[in-house]
């Protein structure tokens, strides 16, 4: 087992209200969670303050997106400075829904990564291929290109978690098999070794996202290069506790 600390992020996406999220937070606050796992919940921006004020301090909070500058005439956007002002330490960037629903480019995501790290926010940087890309055999090309743009904008890797999320497995009920996940994670680590450094390759956590459940999390967590999860739908349910404790 690696020395990398297991990391589980919950991405609530555009879900929940104060009542339902309050119940979820109560479940997390009273659950027995593995001390050897970092836990971070990605709340909708309008509930960041609420989530931070209600969640136990051992659980981190992440924004689900932000913009690439500190302030200005960018209606509807939030900045890393605002996120920090709410006591939040993390942000999710480059999620496939940002890329494919909202048309965010690799370049924009890279600029956001750079600005967030300069602002002392931790970054959960997402990468992953679409179904047609996997079927065409271009998975490596796609994820390496996405990773390169992120890497070009990182000076300090200690605040970065890489999240591999095959787009065909997000919210579809299809999961990459433990072997498929391990294969891509291992290749990503190899890319970091060749293009960044041995130290970064050995220390950066590469987490898996895509229909992770209480039922499949233990087998995925047993893979050598799977250092945790970014969980969507299941992070809104009590089974999120089982996923957090996948390595217990």
From Swiss-Prot:
Pathway: Carbohydrate degradation; glycolysis; D-glyceraldehyde 3-phosphate from glycerone phosphate: step 1/1; Carbohydrate biosynthesis; gluconeogenesis. Substrate binds at residues 11, 13. Its EC number is 5.3.1.1, 4.2.3.3. Keywords: Cytoplasm, Gluconeogenesis, Glycolysis, Isomerase, Lyase. It holds the Pfam family TIM. GO terms for molecular function: methylglyoxal synthase activity; protein homodimerization activity; triose-phosphate isomerase activity. The active site is at 95 (electrophile), 165 (proton acceptor). Its main location: cytoplasm. One of its GO terms (biological process) is methylglyoxal biosynthetic process. It is found in: Cytoplasm. One of its GO terms (cellular component) is cytosol. It catalyses: dihydroxyacetone phosphate = methylglyoxal + phosphate; D-glyceraldehyde 3-phosphate = dihydroxyacetone phosphate. Belongs to the triosephosphate isomerase family. Homodimer. Triosephosphate isomerase is an extremely efficient metabolic enzyme that catalyzes the interconversion between dihydroxyacetone phosphate (DHAP) and D-glyceraldehyde-3-phosphate (G3P) in glycolysis and gluconeogenesis. This is Triosephosphate isomerase A. It comes from Danio rerio.
